[in-house]
A protein has these predicted regions:
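N-terminal alpha/beta PP-like core and its mobile active-site loop of ThDP/TPP-dependent enzymes
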Residues: 1-102
Length: 102
């Protein structure tokens, strides 16, 4: 049986779900996933200056395209900086998925 790393499996799953844009802010806990994302060209990576901007950009992307907004941030403050944007998307039933490091 062929083995595949969790990073490759994560990126493969995103592609299979039709994700073509990801809003991400790399950090220590997600650096391996970020490295895997940068090796491919099917998913465009938007790198903002702050996680709060990232989640609101993903929300706007979902609202304007009808596609799911996908976020990837590191643990700790990276994750907590998503809260307001997640609440906004949840309140308005906007399709938004956020992944954080552990």
């Amino acid at each position: 049986m062929k083995q595949i790393s969790g990073n490759k499996l994560f990126v493969k799953a995103l592609k299979e779900e039709g994700v073509d844009v990801l809003f991400g802010y790399p950090g220590a806990c997600t650096i391996d996933i970020s490295d895997e994302l940068y090796k491919q060209s099917d998913i465009d990576i938007i790198l903002p200056r702050h996680e709060q901007a990232l989640v609101h950009e993903a929300d706007a992307y979902a609202r304007t395209t009808g596609k799911v907004g996908v976020c990837l941030v590191t643990s700790g403050p990276g994750a907590t900086n998503l809260v307001t944007g997640l609440a906004t998307a949840n309140y308005d039933s906007v399709p938004l998925v956020c992944f954080t490091g552990q």
